[in-house]
Design a protein with these regions (language model features):
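Conserved residues at the C-terminal ends of beta-strands
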Residues: 10, 34, 85, 116, ...
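Short Gly/Thr/Asp-enriched flexible loops that form oxyanion-binding sites at enzyme active sites
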Residues: 17-24, 150-154
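Extracellular/periplasmic periplasmic-binding protein-like sensory domains
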Residues: 46, 153-192
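Short gly/pro/ser/thr-enriched loop/turn and capping motifs at secondary-structure boundaries
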Residues: 36-42, 58, 169-174
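Short, well-ordered alpha-helical microsegments
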Residues: 15-17, 122, 146-148, 170-175
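N-terminal (or domain-start) structured segment
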Residues: 1-6, 11
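Extracellular/periplasmic Venus flytrap/periplasmic-binding protein
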Residues: 2, 38-39, 47-156
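Short beta-strand elements of ligand-binding domains
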Residues: 8-10, 29-38, 162-169
């Protein structure tokens, strides 16, 4: 009342997790646009959270739908292997429930590859990709982690045409210095 915040928009998944527990008592709406806790889309459980224009489950599912479409349908993913390279944080792990559920529904194998912050040391991750030979790689990355992943994919010979990112994984400022090495890489995007 009188001088307090009318709304929180933290612009951070980690902060969103912390505030989600606090906003019901404070009765201040928490707005997230494309980030935050995906499970807050259930308004019956999270009455003070308002995830606008999608969340990480939407991004992950959109990527998986695209992969399924390029293969001729969901049934064609049965027996395939999809690696998920993700930032080892609340942000990165947000993708895991939807890819895990889709894996169970459609019979593809998941290879989960967490990358510790800040994401500049990925050689071991991409050696695993080379050894495990996934049919596709889905990336839940951001910042320096994204160009590092693409450079390591090049170094290990993994084709960028089989790499797909969620929205922060396609940020132009993060990819511009990679140049031609990123050719073939795709990411779903909100307006950036």
């Amino acid at each position: 009342k009188h001088g307090g915040a009318t709304v929180f928009q933290p612009l951070s998944t980690g902060i969103t997790f912390a505030l989600t527990e606090k906003v019901p008592a404070d009765k201040i709406p928490l707005i997230t646009s494309g980030y935050g806790r995906s499970d807050t889309a259930d308004g019956s459980m999270f009455k003070w959270n308002f995830p606008l224009i999608g969340h990480y489950w939407v991004a992950g599912d959109t990527v998986l739908q695209h992969i399924a479409k390029t293969q001729g349908g969901w049934d064609k993913l049965k027996g395939k292997k999809i690696a998920v390279v993700f930032h080892d944080s609340a942000f990165g792990k947000e993708l895991l429930p939807i890819v895990t559920e889709r894996s169970k529904m459609h019979g593809f194998e998941l290879l989960l590859l967490p990358v510790p912050a800040p994401g500049v040391e990925q050689k071991a991750i991409w050696l695993q990709v080379r050894q495990q030979k996934p049919d596709f790689v889905v990336m839940q990355t951001w910042g320096v982690m994204t160009p590092t992943a693409i450079k390591e994919a090049v170094a290990t010979g993994y084709p960028r045409e089989k790499m797909f990112g969620t929205w922060w994984s396609g940020a132009e400022p993060d990819l511009k210095d990679v140049g031609a090495a990123a050719k073939g890489y795709s990411a779903v995007m909100m307006q950036h």
